[in-house]
Regions:
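Short hydrophobic beta/alpha edge segments that flank linear recognition/processing sites
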Residues: 105-108, 135-151
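Zn2+-dependent peptidoglycan hydrolase active-site motif and core
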Residues: 86-130, 152-160
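Acidic, glycine-rich catalytic/binding loops that coordinate metals and/or anionic ligands
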Residues: 79, 130, 135-138, 142, ...
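Short amphipathic beta-strand/extended segments with alternating polar/hydrophobic composition
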Residues: 50-54, 63, 118-121, 172-185
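Small beta-barrel nucleic-acid-binding modules, principally OB-folds
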Residues: 65-78, 107-114, 165-176
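Surface-exposed, glycine-biased beta-strand/turn segments
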Residues: 2-104, 136, 149, 187
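Feature marks short, surface-exposed loop/turn motifs that line or immediately flank catalytic pockets
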Residues: 114, 125, 142, 147, ...
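A residue-level detector for short acidic-glycine micro-motifs
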Residues: 75, 95, 120-123, 145, ...
Length: 189
C-alpha cells in the first residue's frame, strides 16, 4: 500500500466525520495491538479442532429476543472441560462468575480499555480471580456448555466458547464483531 494514498484517504474521511472516525480508528489500532492469540489453544494431534462462523448479529431467543454479540467457537469433540481457553489479550480480570446467559464466564479488560468476554466455560484456571493480571496466551479455563438457566446449568447446547469484544463508545457499551479478528489470529494459537 502506498502510504500517501492511505493518509490522503484518511484525511478525506475525517473531513466528513472527524471525531467518530478518529474514535473508531483508535479502537481498531487498539484491537490490533491487544489481540495476540486465538482464544482456544491449538491441538497437538489434530489439524482442525474447532469450527466457527460469523454469527455476530444473528437472532437469539433465550431470555427474550436479542442479537448475538460474539462468535461461537465450537469444539469438534463436543466434550466439556477438554479444550483449553486462553487469553486473546493481556489485561485485568474484571468479571468472573455466573451469568444466566453466559454461564461461567471471565471478562478481561485490556490496558487499552477493550473488554474481552469468554463465556460458557466448564471451569476456570486454578486460583484466577477478579483483579488478577493475565498475559496474552495465558490459560484461563476450559470450554464448556454452561448457561441458559440457574447457576450451574449445563448441557442445553453443544460445547463451545462464546467470545465477545466490547468497547465503551461514549453512549454506553457496544459489541464489536470478532469474526474477522479471529480469522486473522488462526495461526496464533
Amino acid at each position: 500500500l502506498d502510504k500517501r494514498v492511505c493518509v490522503r484517504n484518511k484525511n478525506r474521511l475525517m473531513h466528513f466525520n472527524g471525531e467518530e472516525f478518529e474514535f473508531y480508528t483508535n479502537v481498531i489500532d487498539s484491537l490490533i495491538i491487544d489481540m495476540e492469540y486465538f482464544p482456544v489453544a491449538r491441538s497437538k494431534t489434530r489439524k482442525t479442532w474447532v469450527e466457527y462462523e460469523d454469527s455476530w448479529g444473528n437472532e437469539r431467543t433465550y431470555g427474550g429476543k436479542r442479537t448475538h454479540e460474539g462468535c461461537d467457537i465450537m469444539s469438534e469433540e463436543n466434550k466439556r472441560g477438554v479444550m483449553p481457553v486462553i487469553a486473546a489479550s493481556g489485561g485485568t480480570v474484571t468479571n468472573l462468575g455466573w451469568l444466566e446467559l453466559g454461564g461461567w464466564r471471565i471478562g478481561i479488560t485490556s490496558d487499552n480499555g477493550i473488554y474481552y468476554y469468554y463465556a460458557h466455560l466448564a471451569s476456570y484456571a486454578d486460583n484466577i480471580k477478579c483483579g488478577d493480571r493475565v498475559k496474552a496466551g495465558q490459560f484461563i479455563g476450559y470450554m464448556g456448555n454452561t448457561g441458559y438457566g440457574d447457576e450451574g446449568t449445563s448441557g442445553k447446547f453443544p460445547v463451545h466458547l462464546h467470545f465477545g469484544i466490547y468497547i465503551k463508545d461514549g453512549i454506553g457499551e457496544s459489541s464489536i464483531n470478532p469474526f474477522y479478528l479471529l480469522k486473522k489470529l488462526e495461526k496464533c494459537r
